[in-house]
Amino acid sequence: MAVVRTINGDVSPDTLGVVNAHDHLIRVGAGEVYIDPDHLLDDVDKAAREATYFVEASKSWAAGGTIIDMCPASSGRGVLKTLQVVEKVPGLQVVQATGFHQQKVYLEWRQSWVNQYTVTQIADLLIADIVEGIDRFDYMGPIVERTNVKAGVIKWATAYGKITEWEKKSGQAVAIASKETGCPINTHVTAGTCGPEQARFLVDQGVDPV
């Protein structure tokens, strides 16, 4: 039977209500915030207020709503804060991502763990996010401390007009993690480019397109 892995556990797909398939509730730091400080989203009360608007609007069609928080690994995930948001908003469910943003978001990408680890090692970390629990430090290292919050979707993002070598490596790991766990992949394009190329890449890696 199909399940959706939310931050509070697995649920049936028919309980999701209205689904916001790509949003950001909490972002506590990392590359995007250094690029543009307006990307900082670390206020639980403000996030809860925004999420409440969504849930209330969703009630025109369903009992509640689900937000897919697409902040991936080492990109400012603050899953313990996200849990607090859900506690404050009745009718809200959240699915948290693992995976990767595009290369440029990782400002020190040459020294990033994606650059230094093997594809298998990277995939193992994504799999652990899904089956064990997301690292409370968001793989900003060196210590890893698993939470009870498990990832329910794998993000893979690519650059403008091309898929870089770094992104091909992250994409290989994303594909392995998806095949091993059955967790779906949600891709992110830049300015509308490389969608077909992403699909071809993932299918070539053995990901089921259905």
Where are these regions (language model features)?
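N-terminal basic/disordered segments at the start of proteins
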Residues: 2-23
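Active-site gating/metal-coordination segments in enzymes
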Residues: 84, 88, 93-184
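Alpha-helical scaffold segments that flank or form the walls of functional sites
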Residues: 16-28, 34-93, 118-149
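Glycine-rich phosphate-binding "P-loop"
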Residues: 33-43, 156-162, 185-187
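Catalytic pocket-lining loop regions of alpha/beta-barrel enzymes
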Residues: 175, 179-210
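Short secondary-structure boundary/capping elements
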Residues: 42-49, 163-170, 194
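Active-site beta-loop-alpha junctions enriched in small/polar residues
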Residues: 24-26, 72-73, 97-103, 159, ...
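Distinct, well-ordered alpha-helical segments
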Residues: 82, 109, 165-169, 193-206
